[in-house]
Amino acid sequence: MKTLYSLRRFYHVETLFNGTLALAGRDQETTGFAWWAGNARLINLSGKLLGAHVAHAGLIVFWAGAMNLFEVAHFVPEKPMYEQGLILLPHLATLGWGVGPGGEVIDTFPYFVSGVLHLISSAVLGFGGIYHALLGPETLEESFPFFGYVWKDRNKMTTILGIHLILLGVGAFLLVFKALYFGGVYDTWAPGGGDVRKITNLTLSPSVIFGYLLKSPFGGEGWIVSVDDLEDIIEGHVWLGSICIFGGIWHILTKPFAWARRALVWSGEAYLSYSLAALSVCGFIACCFVWFNNTAYPSEFYGPTGPEASQAQAFTFLVRDQRLGANVGSAQGPTGLGKYLMRSPTGEVIFGGETMRFWDLRAPWLEPLRGPNGLDLSRLKKDIQPWQERRSAEYMTHAPLGSLNSVGGVATEINAVNYVSPRSWLSTSHFVLGFFLFVGHLWHAGRARAAAAGFEKGIDRDFEPVLSMTPLN
């Protein structure tokens, strides 16, 4: 009975809808998958599957290089990046390349170099993909056992997982080294309106870094998305890189424990579903980060966040009316609350009016005007700098609102420009992609579990109703 049970539980079934599984060939008869099922035809052809993945990487890197050069070719240094529909150059600028004080672009050559390097890399990957798809061995197990695998070989699968984790850890440390040793990164909080600087005082305190994970995801807490300190971002990459590398070594050296062998499904489609779930989580987190966070995604490059644009409008009109003689500390608005300033429920002085709901915004142009109890009235009267006025006026008219068909801005704002914020594009696209990846996870997880349990859902293609219907023409 024991043998029967373990066979039933772990018997290796790839989810084919018909046909038998054969090694040779990539057609429907030998694999059970039609041409449009793509890589499913290559489930047991490790060499060809390698070709497909390398070619896919080549396409990704080619897009990055081509789009990078396209943005460089269209870039106008006199306009902010976020007014030009750029999504790649802001990332390069955030890494400290080509920018100076205040986020001003002083050199576009690093951006050109980045584009060319990606194009060259994509050519190498493209060649490798075509080679392995067309010329290389169909399977790697015989000639290159280190790179070969069988999907149900749990030990080999966790070894591959370990290698991937180490590579991810190395990637995290690349950012750390850039910030510490290779020119630094752009810090929007640098005094006077942001600058590129090297990170000098990493505290590495686990209570600080992992404290973010324990925060509530709502309101003034904001979970990990609330990070507003460049040191903490780089420290986080030190911790995460270390965990990934040590976890990778652990998975290479160990075999899966009994509980893991029992709990997980060990098939190619199951691993696909796990990967899709992980990518989905990454997409949703990236969506929240680019929408709310103005430290990892500086507003100088990505435009203001929604709360930031709203608070900037309140600040701009406070500055204007104060110059015209208004007493901003006591003026009443139409609701009886303060017109310019009011108190939050916990007693801080905050901007009044509709923007009161964004009272917990932190932004580099605003923080110098705060005291121990919120906005400081004496600083608002005496200490406002011209750069703060300029920046808030700019952010006020560039709210990340509007539809993705380029009719942007606040509908009632007479000074609005035809503009859609990169934050709108990046957060929307990552939410949508994260959602579709999650649906893909559910789909492939369901199929993988059904196959592992010994039954499969689906139509037998030999008897599809469509085969007996009159052709459309």
From Swiss-Prot:
InterPro entries, per database record: PS_antenna-like (IPR000932), PS_II_antenna-like_sf (IPR036001), PSII_PsbC (IPR005869), PSII_PsbC_sf (IPR044900)
Membrane topology (UniProt): Multi-pass membrane protein
Cell location: Plastid, Chloroplast thylakoid membrane
GO cellular component: chloroplast thylakoid membrane; photosystem II
Sequence positions bearing N-acetylthreonine: 15
Chain positions with Phosphothreonine modification: 15
Highest taxon of the lineage: Eukaryota
Comment on bound cofactor: Binds multiple chlorophylls and provides some of the ligands for the Ca-4Mn-5O cluster of the oxygen-evolving complex. It may also provide a ligand for a Cl- that is required for oxygen evolution. PSII binds additional chlorophylls, carotenoids and specific lipids.
Propeptide residues, chain positions: 1-14
Main location (coarse class): plastid
Parts of the chain that traverse the membrane: 69-93, 134-155, 178-200, 255-275, 291-312, 447-471
GO biological process assignments: photosynthetic electron transport in photosystem II
UniProt keyword list: Acetylation, Chlorophyll, Chloroplast, Chromophore, Manganese, Membrane, Metal-binding, Phosphoprotein, Photosynthesis, Photosystem II, Plastid, Thylakoid, Transmembrane, Transmembrane helix
Binding site for [CaMn4O5] cluster: 367
Coiled coil: none
GO molecular function, one term: chlorophyll binding
Subunit structure: PSII is composed of 1 copy each of membrane proteins PsbA, PsbB, PsbC, PsbD, PsbE, PsbF, PsbH, PsbI, PsbJ, PsbK, PsbL, PsbM, PsbT, PsbX, PsbY, PsbZ, Psb30/Ycf12, at least 3 peripheral proteins of the oxygen-evolving complex and a large number of cofactors. It forms dimeric complexes.
Xref: HAMAP family: PSII_PsbC_CP43
Function: One of the components of the core complex of photosystem II (PSII). It binds chlorophyll and helps catalyze the primary light-induced photochemical processes of PSII. PSII is a light-driven water:plastoquinone oxidoreductase, using light energy to abstract electrons from H(2)O, generating O(2) and a proton gradient subsequently used for ATP formation.
Protein family per UniProt: Belongs to the PsbB/PsbC family. PsbC subfamily.
Name of the featured protein: Photosystem II CP43 reaction center protein
Natural source organism: Crucihimalaya wallichii (Rock-cress)
Gene: psbC
